[in-house]
Amino acid sequence: MLFRSYIAWVGHATYLIKLGNTTIITDHIFSKNAGPLIFGPKRFTEPALKLNEIPKTDIFLLTHNHYDHQDMSTIRNFPFKDAKVLVPLKLGKYFKNYKDVNEMDWYEEIKINDHLKITFLPAVHWSKRSLTDTNKTLWGNFLIQYKNIKILFACDTGYGNIYKEIGEKYGPIDITMINIGAYDFRPMFYKSIYHTTPEEALNVAQDLRSKKVLGMHWGTFVLSLEPIMEPPVRFKENAEKFGFKKKDAITFKIGEINSLKSILKD
């Protein structure tokens, strides 16, 4: 890669985040379906690269156990099983043959090195993989602190007052990475309380006192009824209502790579 520190979108909630000499992958899913075996929503867009093409990865972050985030085929075939794995409580059992698996409770932090610390924080979400395991494993967000830069990886989440509390304790945040798609589930209900709309994502970032907000979790799988390309349009159009310049409400194209320096530029 060209940059010492960068963020690259592979698709959905899968990102490669390079911070100095450390490469992080998030919620990686490379399967064609977001479900068990061959079932579940099919991909609308292919991942930016194949699993065997990803660069050497040092840290693997998993936010929760839903099929579009915890993809067992990808976990089994992940080429870097010596990576440090950070997962919510009770999800470590899925990472057989991995050498360094760390289950985390909310507000628990792990120091990676002298320049990098990762804290697991609450999210407005839930967990489930079968008919009998609803909310039996934890879920959450990851706060990545690299030198003097704070990146909050918030996916999946709905809107809640918890973000004002997080903003007071950990803010201001430099970059909030948050879901902006999969919110329209009519006729069951008008919108998901567990997935922010583009406007709610901006509200979360506002509560966090975030400088930049990067919208994700759209354009990859058809998970709900809104037009698949609607989220980034609404996200950009409504930025100023929540105190952001349009240029600070950021979306990538799948496969796009941007240096941390360019993302943070005023």
Kindly give the residue locations of the regions a language model identified.
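Metal-dependent catalytic neighborhoods of phosphoester/phosphodiester hydrolases
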Residues: 71-80, 223-233, 261-262
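Glycine/Thr-rich phosphate-binding loops of Rossmann-like dinucleotide-binding domains
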Residues: 34, 70, 95, 128, ...
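Catalytic core of the metallo-beta-lactamase
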Residues: 14-20, 112-174, 192-200
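Metallo-beta-lactamase
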Residues: 4, 84-149, 234-256, 260-264
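Pre-active-site segment of Zn-dependent metallo-hydrolases
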Residues: 1-4, 10, 14-62, 72-77, ...
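Cap/insert and terminal regions of metallo-dependent hydrolase folds
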Residues: 54, 59, 84-86, 90-93, ...
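Divalent metal-coordination and catalytic microenvironments
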Residues: 17, 27, 64, 71, ...
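Active-site metal-binding loops of divalent metal-dependent hydrolases
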Residues: 28-30, 65, 123-124, 155-157, ...
